[in-house]
Curated annotation (Swiss-Prot):
One of its GO terms (biological process) is alkaloid metabolic process. It comes from the Eukaryota. It comes from Penicillium fellutanum. One of its GO terms (molecular function) is prenyltransferase activity. Signal peptide: none annotated. The record marks G119 as: Required for regioselectivity. The keyword 4Fe-4S does not apply. Brevianamide F binds at E101. This is Prenyltransferase phqI. The gene is phqI.
Length: 462
């Protein structure tokens, strides 16, 4: 991934024409100067996250016009839905509880530029309180706002349907006041994904039905099956779900933290994804998951498995059992990270597509980033792999040199020294890996997405 010496990446010696002291302003700088923030919380969220997003966009090859478009969407549409700062409600979409996560997707074939994505759970001041204990109000509010933005091909109908089918209702929230459910500290019920593609933003929805399943004493697989049956007339048959359900039922593969995803497009065109997790982080389990216990045997599946094992070895992932019980790892609470995967299902297709998520949160960033750099170069993406380590260091400056902020001040200090990756283990969060004949390797890297790094003292001790 090449660091551009353009508006997004200005060296200290690169100065504006006719000015011997002022650096060229970035897209982030321009928006920071011109935007009127409703309150100090929004301003701090922008300062702590916006410049990182600008850097990621630039390094992924987004030209200034595309970066301006993406950052304008972020500052105008998403920033108002991040709620109070510092965040009080802990979101299930990240290990730290942060309600957003930036990632970059790479595709081996097709000469496709990287795509920057944002995982996002909208939050408000009432999130997690008695007013909105399961953070459901901001999700509907953001969905309503997206509907009036005229995003090409955006269709909220599946999101609204699954919100009703998969998330706790008023009666169930009353029962939850009286009945403690294991894992219920993960109270998130739904979230969004935004792919910042060249021609339009692509929107995905996520639901987290685990609490509703457990409360109603239903198995996750049967619960999902019942929820998609009413859609059959509108969407068509989904035979791949039967294969997925058979494998997961036979191997006790439905985790209590399983969740669901879909594209916010015409339901007949949407992909459906079933996510699960496992605490046994060993290659033999990965191979079983990838092939659905031997049910998927095509040459393409086997080719993908070879690449998957190569990346597994290059990242030097620690193998063994990880005691994940649904908690967070945010500098206060510490829990290990499990393996996660999803099965992508399309209307009328007999076989699902497996996507595996490497549990790299808590692993050496140096090993992970070094392994990723080698892998990108080996699969023909050397224009990103050759400079990947330098690019990530540029994203994530040395947190230990950041000044302690006053109330409502930004702590961002992007001129501070680059972070020593050999001493960190949580700058990178996940690597997702899929493989198809059309795309070849389809890989995404997820990053801790704020200049606040809550694990600094923990990692200095270790």
């Amino acid at each position: 991934m090449t660091i551009e010496a353009t508006e997004g990446h200005v060296s200290k010696g690169m100065l504006a024409k006719g000015d011997s002291t002022s650096p060229i302003p970035t897209i982030f700088d321009v928006l920071s100067r011109d935007h009127v923030f409703v309150d100090s919380h929004q301003k701090v969220w922008w300062e702590r996250t916006g410049q990182l997003l600008d850097k990621i966009l630039a390094s992924a090859g987004y030209n200034p016009a595309r970066r301006l478009e993406a950052l304008t969407f972020y500052i105008q549409v998403l920033i108002p839905f991040l709620g109070p700062h510092p965040h009080q409600f802990r979101s299930a979409i990240t290990r730290s509880g942060l309600p957003l996560e930036f990632s970059v997707n790479y595709q081996q074939r097709g000469d496709i530029d990287p795509v920057v994505r944002i995982g996002f759970e909208p939050v408000a001041a009432a999130s997690g309180t008695e007013i909105d204990p399961y953070n459901q109000i901001p999700v509907v509010d953001l969905l309503n706002q997206l509907e009036v933005l005229n995003i090409p091909a955006f269709d909220p109908s599946l999101f609204r349907y699954f919100l009703d089918a998969h998330t706790v209702n008023g009666h169930e929230k009353g029962l939850l006041k009286e009945k403690k459910i294991e894992g219920s500290e993960l109270t998130s019920q739904s979230a969004f994904g935004f792919d910042l593609k060249e021609k339009a933003i692509s929107v995905k929805g996520y639901t987290f039905p685990a609490i509703k399943c457990t409360l109603n004493e239903k198995g996750f697989g049967n619960f999902i099956s019942e929820s998609i049956q009413p859609l059959a007339a509108q969407m068509g048959p989904i035979p791949s779900f039967d294969m997925v359900h058979s494998y997961l039922e036979g191997t006790n593969g439905y985790s209590q933290f399983a969740f669901w995803s879909f594209d916010c497009v015409d339901p007949a065109q949407s992909r459906l994804k079933l996510y699960s997790s496992h605490n046994s982080v060993v290659w033999s389990k990965v191979e079983e998951i990838w092939t659905l216990g031997g049910r998927a045997k095509s040459p393409v599946v086997q080719e993908g498995l070879v690449y998957l094992k190569e990346l597994w070895e290059l990242t030097k992932l620690s193998e063994g059992h990880r005691e994940f019980n649904g908690g967070f790892d945010d500098g206060k609470d510490a829990t290990a990270t499990p393996m996660v995967w999803n099965y992508e299902m399309k209307i009328g297709e007999a076989f699902p597509l497996t996507k595996f998520y490497f549990p790299i949160h808590g692993e050496s960033d140096q090993n992970v980033i070094g392994g990723l750099a080698q892998f990108l170069s080996r699969i023909g993406l050397s224009k990103y792999g050759d400079n990947y380590e330098a690019t990530v260091r540029h994203y994530l400056y040395d947190f230990s040199t950041s000044p302690v902020p006053c109330k409502n001040d930004s702590i961002a200090n992007f001129d501070s020294p680059e972070r020593d990756l050999s001493k960190t283990a949580r700058l990178t969060s996940w690597i997702s890996f899929a493989y198809t004949e059309k795309t070849g390797v389809y890989l995404s890297v997820y990053y801790h997405s704020s200049d606040e790094y809550p694990w600094l003292e923990l990692e200095e001790i270790n």
